[in-house]
């Protein structure tokens, strides 16, 4: 079976999508490799990402110099958690994969908002990825859930309206309650 077949096909008709934000730390030993070796390893890694990108959305971001626990992040959006796991396995089998260690991994799922049907998450749009992304796990307080639903809905509508004032910002809210330690992942 080829790597393309193992990763599988993305179905665009599914309404359930899974999101994975994987941050990777690069072993300092990587810097000691010769330039030709690093270049070949980078080509191998990028080739793998290109193949996987035909089966799911993958967005890559550099965190170099911005975080001390990661040099890059992969944001995967797929109709299957297994596709993400296959890609992770394949990453670790590459030359570069021998020099990376995951520092943080967040898993979440898409779901229609309880509060508004006016929001289409940025990841669901057929647009190229933005140059920058801010990713953060979010936990709502117990007090939030004790508020009446209509009050929460109104506050969320106000929040959405503020976001609409900045069309260059895309909202990406996904749900991780019961999957991970946070209620939501925001990007």
Indicate where each model-derived feature is located:
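A structural feature that tracks compact, well-ordered secondary-structure segments
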Residues: 24, 63, 73-79, 88-90, ...
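A common structural junction motif
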Residues: 91-99
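Long, hydrophobic/aromatic-enriched structural stretches that serve as scaffold segments
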Residues: 45-79, 83-84
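Catalytic micro-motifs at enzyme active sites that drive phosphoryl/nucleotidyl and oxygen chemistry
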Residues: 8-9, 58-64, 92-93, 121-123, ...
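A short, glycine/Asx- and small/polar-enriched loop/turn
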Residues: 68-70, 180-183
């Amino acid at each position: 079976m080829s790597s393309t077949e193992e990763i599988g096909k993305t179905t665009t008709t599914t309404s359930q999508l899974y999101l994975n934000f994987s941050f990777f730390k690069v072993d300092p030993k990587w810097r000691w490799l010769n330039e030709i070796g690093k270049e070949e390893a980078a080509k191998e890694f990028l080739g793998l990402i290109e193949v996987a990108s035909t089966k799911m959305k993958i967005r890559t971001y550099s965190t170099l110099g911005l975080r001390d626990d990661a040099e890059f992040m992969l944001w995967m959006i797929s109709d299957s958690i297994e596709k993400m796991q296959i890609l992770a396995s394949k990453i670790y089998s590459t030359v570069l994969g021998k020099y990376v260690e995951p520092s943080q991994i967040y898993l979440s799922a898409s779901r229609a908002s309880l509060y508004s049907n006016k929001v289409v998450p940025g990841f669901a749009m057929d647009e190229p990825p933005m140059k920058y992304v801010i990713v953060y796990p979010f936990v709502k307080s117990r007090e939030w859930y004790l508020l009446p639903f209509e009050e929460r809905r109104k506050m969320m509508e106000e929040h959405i309206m503020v976001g609409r004032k900045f069309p260059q910002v895309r909202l990406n809210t996904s749900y991780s309650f019961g999957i991970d330690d946070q209620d939501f992942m925001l990007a």
